[in-house]
């Protein structure tokens, strides 16, 4: 079944923020800091305020007078000692703490006039010392971003697991293996840059925000907090969203400021960011350094795991910036039996753009760490890396399996995933292929990565299904598609639940006036949680419809059977169609006495457990030692996403996730220099993979239905990004093993590989 959205989007009829304009509209532009850390001595806006077409210029002084609050922080680790979440101002006042931080807002009749006026604002800065990288920020005497409030630049400390059990495991271990890995910072490269349009109705005193966001209802809540007003004063309207990947989850200053400016000036105010804005203001992802130690007995069984992670928060804690560093920890053992685990996470402030959730939100970081550590353990113990995994993998008969960090895996065939992947990629025949590559002066390697994700828990979703008199169904749901294909998926679920034609289902998202509640989209929960809520709503409709059908057919409702859109008296051929029943539902004469006309249903789903999508990624590569160039020859995904709703949508999600994972592993590096200047501020400098660099991806499906979900779904949105980095890096390290290289940090650029080969070769020559 093809995507319902595609015709609209491919023929230019999508509705993105920049497609919208309103009468008498004004345009906003933002002056951003050129310094990573500086005291703002003076701001002279006089020339800008008198420039042609300029209606207003606002600074932090104006924001303070208006009484607007800072950006809210939605998440802080709960079991940590009290951390410090600094005030994240809408406009920086006294000090700016990263390149790109907003300092002033210009409002003008045209975008060009706003940009020209912005350039005439004179700011006097007093540069301050910076702490940019994690090592620098943590070093003795490092400049502190928040003196007296976040000593040593530590925003929070979080610990989980059983340290005493780990100490015992390490004491009894025959082998100890350790590794240090860098999970490189990445910039979000969604095809649609951020944007927002603010409107205010003076009569109703309500404000409307058109924007690109993954979470309309949480955004409304944040606006209410900033303005210190009830949520009912705000409406969020979201059309099509051109990619999100997590960076459009949390709120940004521009969304609040255009809304405030619209109130102040009594006219709509529009701001559309460009790609340069995106690179230095969109929340970045990943960026952590982790040390891990694995204890094993003499046979190679895992005994204990000790993890010490340092995560880069940036200059502030964004809405969900503290989530990713701790989000992965409860499931750190993943597919393996590891009796004792302890994790320590330290969130650090640096003079960089804040980080936030990015596709996978911590799970890819943990999977990468563990799969690299296992490969290193196999090398150190001289054990086959497949057999080491097989020895420690959780068998099907152990499920449900409770991990030492409190999760309970309820389904999955982890070893079968591994076996099917090994067979399909011909792992046994690899050495002959390695020899063939060597005859051409190339180095060939093969790698794999097992994974389990935890998704879809802690999120309650409401759904309303509204049936019209002609039998058409409207789905009102509080998730928010940003490219996944929700219109198709929800229409398909509705069609299967109610027996209506797929084309007769309309899906409405992104309107907080029409949809009472919602959590937005993230964590691969939209289909597992949203679909389950739809099932509950459909059951309400079917129950009422059976009562109506019984009245129409002169039978008891308990004798009515529903199948494929028809209601039939059991054991007879007496039936009524969906369309006929829908029409009757709006005719009081044809309804049982006292029944309210209409055929709507509201459903809610409260998950009792996470879903656990799982699988195995396998990758085969070849590299040229003379240039360091790495080529991906084959890429295979064995996946278990529970019941598969739409294979095309699923494969699209995996394609995209793998592309992003390979991008991080081989190409992307959101890097800063020592002064805090961003050195990858355009696509000339920030290297996302081209289509020709993404391999053809092979798929094997091994589904086991999720027992915690009435429809059996597990969620698939982030799995590709989780499995790809370790699979590729493990393959590359395997290709480099002849040089004595047992680890190389991402991204695996040709320059980095070439330098490592050169260094290893020179070392051997000297010896």
Give, region by region, the residue ranges found by the protein language model.
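Flexible, low-hydrophobicity surface segments
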Residues: 1-155, 176-179, 254, 264, ...
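Glycine-rich loop/linker segments at domain edges
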Residues: 5-8, 74-86, 152-196, 287-372, ...
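Extended active-site and interfacial segments that coordinate phosphate-rich ligands
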Residues: 7-8, 121-126, 132, 214-216, ...
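C-terminal catalytic domains of large/alpha subunits in multi-subunit enzymes
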Residues: 51, 61, 73, 81, ...
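Short acidic, glycine/serine/threonine-rich loops at helix termini
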Residues: 68-72, 117-120, 211, 220-222, ...
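Conserved catalytic cysteine-centered active-site region
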Residues: 93-95, 230-238, 263-274, 278
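Conserved beta-alpha junction segments in alpha/beta enzyme cores
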Residues: 166-227, 326, 445-469, 477, ...
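Thiamine diphosphate
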Residues: 244-266, 270-272, 486-494
């Amino acid at each position: 079944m093809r995507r319902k959205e595609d015709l609209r989007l491919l023929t230019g009829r999508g509705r993105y923020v920049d497609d919208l304009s309103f009468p008498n509209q004004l345009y906003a532009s933002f002056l951003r800091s050129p310094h990573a850390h500086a005291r703002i001595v003076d701001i002279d806006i006089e020339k800008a305020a008198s420039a042609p077409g300029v209606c207003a210029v606002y600074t932090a002084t104006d924001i303070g007078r208006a009484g607007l609050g800072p950006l809210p922080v939605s998440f802080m680790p709960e079991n940590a000692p009290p951390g410090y979440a600094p005030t994240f101002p809408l406009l920086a006042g006294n000090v700016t703490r990263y390149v790109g931080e907003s300092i002033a807002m210009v409002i003008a009749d045209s975008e060009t006039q706003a940009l020209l006026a912005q350039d005439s604002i004179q700011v006097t800065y007093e540069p301050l010392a910076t702490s940019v990288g994690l090592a620098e920020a943590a070093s003795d005497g490092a400049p502190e971003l928040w003196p007296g409030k976040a000593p040593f630049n530590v925003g929070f400390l979080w610990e989980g697991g059983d340290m005493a059990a780990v100490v015992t495991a390490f004491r009894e271990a025959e082998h100890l293996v350790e590794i240090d890995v860098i999970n490189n910072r990445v910039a979000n490269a969604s095809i649609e840059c951020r944007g927002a349009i603010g409107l205010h109705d003076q009569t109703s005193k309500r404000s409307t925000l058109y924007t690109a966001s993954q979470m309309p209802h949480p955004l409304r809540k944040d606006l209410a907090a900033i303005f210190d007003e009830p949520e009912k004063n705000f409406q969020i309207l979201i059309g099509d969203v051109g990619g999100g990947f997590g960076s459009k989850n949390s709120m940004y200053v521009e969304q609040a400021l255009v809304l405030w400016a619209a109130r102040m000036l009594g006219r709509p105010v529009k701001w559309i960011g460009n790609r340069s804005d995106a690179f230095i203001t969109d929340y970045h992802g990943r960026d952590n350094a982790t040390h891990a130690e694995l204890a094993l007995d003499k046979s190679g069984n895992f005994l204990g795991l000790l993890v010490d992670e340092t995560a880069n928060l940036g200059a502030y804690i964004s809405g969900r910036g503290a989530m990713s560093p701790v989000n992965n920890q409860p499931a750190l053992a993943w597919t393996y039996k590891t009796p004792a685990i302890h994790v320590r996470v330290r969130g650090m402030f640096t003079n960089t753009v804040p980080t936030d959730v990015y596709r996978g939100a911590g799970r890819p970081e943990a999977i990468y760490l563990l799969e690299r550590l296992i490969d290193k353990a196999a090398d150190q113990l001289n054990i086959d890396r497949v057999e080491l995994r097989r020895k420690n993998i959780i068998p099907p008969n152990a499920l449900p399996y409770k991990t030492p960090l409190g999760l309970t895996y309820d389904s999955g065939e982890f070893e079968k995933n591994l076996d099917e992947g090994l067979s399909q990629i011909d792992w046994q025949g690899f050495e002959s292929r390695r020899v063939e590559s060597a005859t051409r002066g190339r180095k060939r390697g093969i790698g794999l990565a097992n994974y389990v994700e935890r998704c879809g828990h802690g999120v309650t979703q409401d759904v309303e299904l509204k049936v019209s008199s002609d039998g058409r169904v409207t789905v009102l749901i509080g998730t928010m598609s940003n490219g996944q294909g929700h219109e198709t998926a929800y229409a398909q679920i509705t069609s299967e639940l109610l027996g209506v034609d797929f084309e007769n289902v309309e899906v409405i998202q992104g309107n907080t006036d029409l949809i009472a509640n919602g959590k937005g989209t993230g964590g691969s929960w939209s289909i597992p949680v949203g679909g389950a809520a739809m099932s509950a709503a459909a059951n309400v409709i079917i129950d009422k419809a059976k009562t109506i059908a019984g009245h129409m057919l002169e039978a008891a409702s308990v004798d009515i059977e529903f199948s494929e859109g028809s209601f039939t008296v059991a054991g007879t051929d007496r039936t009524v169609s969906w369309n006929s029943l829908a029409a009757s539902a709006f005719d009081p004469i044809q309804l049982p006495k006292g029944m309210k006309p209409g055929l709507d249903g509201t459903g809610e789903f409260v998950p009792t457990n996470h879903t656990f999508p799982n699988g195995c990624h396998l990758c085969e590569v070849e590299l040229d030692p003379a240039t360091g160039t790495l080529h991906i020859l084959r890429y295979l995904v064995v996946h278990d996403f529970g019941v598969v709703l739409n294979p095309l949508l699923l494969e699209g999600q995996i394609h995209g996730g793998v592309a992003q994972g390979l991008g991080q592993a081989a190409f992307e590096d959101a890097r800063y220099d020592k002064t805090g200047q961003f050195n990858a501020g355009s696509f000339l400098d920030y290297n996302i993979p081209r289509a020709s660099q993404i391999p053809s991806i092979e798929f094997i499906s091994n589904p086991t239905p999720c027992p915690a979900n009435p429809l059996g779904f597990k969620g698939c949105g982030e799995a590709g990004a989780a499995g790809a980095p370790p699979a590729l890096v493990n393959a590359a390290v395997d290709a480099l093993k002849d040089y004595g290289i047992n680890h190389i940090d991402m991204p695996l650029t040709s320059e980095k590989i070439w330098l490592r080969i050169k260094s290893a070769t020179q070392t051997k020559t000297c010896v």
